[in-house]
Amino acid sequence: MLDRTPPDAYDNGDRVPVIVLPGIWEPWRFMLPLAKVLHAEGHPIYPVPGLRLNGAPLDASAEKVAEALSEHDAPRVVLVAHSKGGLVGKQLMLHPKVGHRVAGLVALCSPFGGSTLSLPVLARTPLGLFSPANSALTALAAEQAVNAKIVSIGSSYDEMVPNGTHLEGAHNITLEMAGHFRPLVSPSAQQLVLQEVRRFDTSPDPGH
């Protein structure tokens, strides 16, 4: 059966809100295994249904997230992203109107330097974004002011991003597991994401 979890199912909590950003061709519910772990620890979860399957160009995707963020009154949020979602998240951090509201980005398996699997024949498709020579990707890479607020978590081997997920100036972590999708459902990777989200969380401890 198709998952029909409504977007507001996990929007309550007393910790810093988390906006979840899936990868390309992934619906927001693809992030549910990780979102549920974060919500159980008090983080409201804000998905962005307007991204649909996240196949739009980078700037258009970031604008959709900016619109969604504008609908929430939380002064600060943390972004938790998978794959292309990490690129969208960094683009959002550079947004002139809402970028300042992003406390940090925790990205899983995000190809900040593109993927060596990208082929020239894909250049005019949504997958063309992942070419290391793509103009939108290289422009994003040149913007390094926000990198210190990014945690890039990569697998020991990623079949979709074999060249790795290292981002200059970011906090880079390599998991002791392989796979592009496995970290989303791995308890140890989920706990690591939670730990890194907490580094950006300035909310007072509940009950204090």
Region locations from a protein language model:
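A broad structural signal for short, well-ordered beta-strand segments within beta-sheet-rich domains
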Residues: 14, 102, 169-170
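Generic secondary-structure transition motif, activating predominantly at the C-termini of alpha-helices
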Residues: 2-6, 69, 73, 141-144, ...
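C-terminal catalytic-base region of ester-bond hydrolases, centering on the histidine
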Residues: 146-208
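Serine-dependent carboxylesterase/thioesterase catalytic core
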Residues: 18-29, 33, 37-148, 160
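Generic hydrophobic alpha-helical membrane-segment signal
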Residues: 5, 10-11, 97, 122, ...
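Alpha/beta-hydrolase fold catalytic core
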Residues: 1-16, 40, 208
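Short secondary-structure boundary/capping segments
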Residues: 9-10, 69, 141-144, 163-165, ...
